[in-house]
Amino acid sequence: NQPFSDGVSARDIADLPQEVKDHFKELSNAANRHGGLHAASGTLGSGANNNVRLALLNIVFKSAGLPEQYHQARFVLRLKKQGIFDQIKDKVETAGDSWDEELEDLYVSRSIAGGLLEVDSTLGDDVKGVRQLLREQYPNVQDVTNQQMVDAIHDALASQGQFPLTLVVLDEVQQYVGSDTDKA
């Protein structure tokens, strides 16, 4: 129930029956106890090589403000976990590069590898070594296991050990699955 720019929320505008208002209040109270609320929505099948787990992760990552691609999101999550995300991003941008463009070229980005080397010299002897480490540590995968998917969702959404009450809305599921029993 995020407020609009004028401070009014959707719940304040809508004329809702008392029972519905009570349910929303209960939801808000539960959210306060469990790390907040989070919603993710998107269309299955867009950019995940016909892999339902990666398609779901793309949607969740995007909703959390992360890159949609698994390897890039895991890299950003690792930087955030180590507390060096802002430092690395600043170093990339100070070098005159766009963070998003460099992240897209993660394996060949001189500014990302150089920034990592400046922040943690134990990652490699030179930029070339750090690039190789990035390729090995964050490979571009074609699939993930169920456990890797669950772990990635938890890492993307949990904050301070709490997982928010989460709603995931998937559009075009029937079209995505079609008659493919592997997807079903």
Residue ranges and their predicted role:
Residues 161-181:
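Conserved P-loop NTPase "ATPase switch" module shared by AAA+ and STAND
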Residues 2, 54-61, 151, 155, ...:
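A broad, structural surface signal
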Residues 47-52, 126, 174-178, 184:
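Flexible loop/turn segments at secondary-structure boundaries
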Residues 1-15, 139-142, 154, 174-184:
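Signature of the SF2 helicase/ATPase Hel1-core->accessory helical subdomain module
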Residues 1-108:
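P-loop NTPase motor core
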